[in-house]
Swiss-Prot record:
Gene Ontology biological process terms from the UniProt entry: alkane catabolic process
Protein name according to UniProt: Rubredoxin
Keywords noted in UniProt: Electron transport, Iron, Metal-binding, Transport
Cofactor requirements of the protein: Fe(3+)
Amino acid sequence: MGTYMCDLCGWGYNPEVGDADGGIPAGTAFENLPDHWECPLCGVDKTSFVKV
């Protein structure tokens, strides 16, 4: 599992933390995020994220 960063706003998704506000529990790999998940800061879909 790796960290992914939003190309638009720079928000980082860390799978060890998850996205509690978005209903994503800690330990969820980026690849396992639901298709409808979007950046909690700017709202773009997960195709706008790059692995860092």
